[in-house]
Protein backbone atom coordinates (compact mmCIF):
# COMPACT_ATOMS: atom_id res chain seq x y z
CA UNK A 1 0.00 0.00 0.00
CA UNK A 2 2.82 2.41 0.88
CA UNK A 3 4.59 1.55 -2.40
CA UNK A 4 1.44 2.44 -4.36
CA UNK A 5 1.29 5.87 -2.70
CA UNK A 6 4.94 6.48 -3.60
CA UNK A 7 4.33 5.45 -7.22
CA UNK A 8 1.23 7.64 -7.52
CA UNK A 9 3.08 10.61 -6.01
CA UNK A 10 6.03 10.09 -8.38
CA UNK A 11 3.70 9.82 -11.39
CA UNK A 12 1.85 13.03 -10.47
CA UNK A 13 5.14 14.86 -9.98
CA UNK A 14 6.49 13.65 -13.33
CA UNK A 15 3.31 14.62 -15.18
CA UNK A 16 3.40 18.07 -13.56
CA UNK A 17 7.00 18.62 -14.61
CA UNK A 18 6.32 17.53 -18.18
CA UNK A 19 3.27 19.79 -18.38
CA UNK A 20 5.24 22.86 -17.31
CA UNK A 21 8.38 22.17 -19.32
CA UNK A 22 10.11 24.99 -21.12
CA UNK A 23 10.89 25.14 -24.81
CA UNK A 24 14.22 24.61 -26.52
CA UNK A 25 15.66 26.84 -29.22
CA UNK A 26 15.31 23.93 -31.65
CA UNK A 27 11.59 23.57 -30.92
CA UNK A 28 11.00 27.30 -31.24
CA UNK A 29 12.97 27.42 -34.53
CA UNK A 30 10.68 24.92 -36.25
CA UNK A 31 8.84 26.45 -39.20
CA UNK A 32 11.04 29.55 -39.37
CA UNK A 33 12.23 30.24 -42.91
CA UNK A 34 15.66 31.43 -43.98
CA UNK A 35 15.84 35.24 -43.86
CA UNK A 36 13.33 35.64 -41.03
CA UNK A 37 14.26 37.30 -37.74
CA UNK A 38 14.02 36.30 -34.10
CA UNK A 39 14.83 38.03 -30.81
CA UNK A 40 16.31 36.46 -27.70
CA UNK A 41 15.32 38.52 -24.66
CA UNK A 42 17.36 38.20 -21.47
CA UNK A 43 15.37 39.81 -18.67
CA UNK A 44 17.03 40.28 -15.28
CA UNK A 45 15.86 41.85 -12.06
CA UNK A 46 17.96 44.92 -11.25
CA UNK A 47 19.62 43.08 -8.35
CA UNK A 48 20.77 40.34 -10.79
CA UNK A 49 23.23 42.83 -12.27
CA UNK A 50 25.67 41.72 -9.58
CA UNK A 51 24.80 38.01 -9.82
CA UNK A 52 25.83 37.52 -13.43
CA UNK A 53 28.16 34.58 -12.83
CA UNK A 54 26.25 32.33 -10.49
CA UNK A 55 22.65 33.36 -11.09
CA UNK A 56 20.20 33.24 -8.22
CA UNK A 57 17.97 30.77 -6.41
CA UNK A 58 14.66 32.62 -6.69
CA UNK A 59 13.17 33.18 -10.13
CA UNK A 60 11.58 36.60 -9.67
CA UNK A 61 10.95 38.27 -13.04
CA UNK A 62 14.16 36.94 -14.60
CA UNK A 63 13.70 34.89 -17.77
CA UNK A 64 15.10 34.16 -21.19
CA UNK A 65 12.62 34.19 -24.08
CA UNK A 66 12.82 33.69 -27.85
CA UNK A 67 10.38 35.70 -29.96
CA UNK A 68 9.85 34.65 -33.57
CA UNK A 69 6.77 36.62 -34.55
CA UNK A 70 4.55 33.54 -34.56
CA UNK A 71 2.65 34.81 -31.53
CA UNK A 72 1.92 31.32 -30.23
CA UNK A 73 2.90 32.16 -26.62
CA UNK A 74 5.45 29.33 -26.54
CA UNK A 75 8.42 31.68 -26.36
CA UNK A 76 9.80 30.91 -22.90
CA UNK A 77 13.23 29.26 -23.01
CA UNK A 78 13.95 29.43 -19.28
CA UNK A 79 12.45 31.07 -16.21
CA UNK A 80 14.85 32.38 -13.61
CA UNK A 81 18.49 33.25 -14.06
CA UNK A 82 21.19 30.59 -13.88
CA UNK A 83 24.12 32.90 -14.68
CA UNK A 84 25.63 34.12 -17.93
CA UNK A 85 27.10 30.72 -18.72
CA UNK A 86 23.52 29.66 -19.47
CA UNK A 87 23.04 32.68 -21.76
CA UNK A 88 26.16 31.64 -23.68
CA UNK A 89 24.78 28.09 -24.00
CA UNK A 90 21.56 29.50 -25.51
CA UNK A 91 23.48 31.78 -27.90
CA UNK A 92 25.55 28.79 -29.05
CA UNK A 93 22.33 26.80 -29.44
CA UNK A 94 20.99 29.58 -31.68
CA UNK A 95 24.07 29.31 -33.90
CA UNK A 96 23.80 25.52 -34.04
CA UNK A 97 20.16 25.86 -35.17
CA UNK A 98 21.00 28.12 -38.12
CA UNK A 99 20.70 31.59 -36.57
CA UNK A 100 23.21 34.45 -37.03
CA UNK A 101 23.56 37.27 -34.48
CA UNK A 102 22.85 40.63 -36.15
CA UNK A 103 22.71 43.11 -33.26
CA UNK A 104 22.25 43.52 -29.52
CA UNK A 105 20.71 46.37 -27.59
CA UNK A 106 19.93 46.99 -23.91
CA UNK A 107 16.70 48.32 -22.42
CA UNK A 108 16.87 49.62 -18.87
CA UNK A 109 13.73 49.99 -16.78
CA UNK A 110 13.24 50.97 -13.17
CA UNK A 111 13.52 47.41 -11.86
CA UNK A 112 14.58 45.36 -14.90
CA UNK A 113 17.64 45.02 -17.11
CA UNK A 114 16.65 43.70 -20.53
CA UNK A 115 18.99 42.81 -23.38
CA UNK A 116 17.70 41.91 -26.82
CA UNK A 117 19.77 39.80 -29.20
CA UNK A 118 18.52 40.16 -32.79
CA UNK A 119 19.11 37.07 -34.95
CA UNK A 120 18.50 36.22 -38.60
CA UNK A 121 17.78 32.67 -39.74
CA UNK A 122 20.54 31.81 -42.23
CA UNK A 123 20.07 28.05 -42.54
CA UNK A 124 16.91 26.01 -42.97
Predicted regions, residues:
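Terminus-proximal functional modules
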Residues: 2-8, 19-124
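Repetitive helical segments and hydrophobic/amphipathic motifs
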Residues: 13-14
Amino acid sequence: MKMNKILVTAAITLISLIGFSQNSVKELSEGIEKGQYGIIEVRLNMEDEFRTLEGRDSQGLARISFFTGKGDKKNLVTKGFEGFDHVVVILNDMKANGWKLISTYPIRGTSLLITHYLFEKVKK
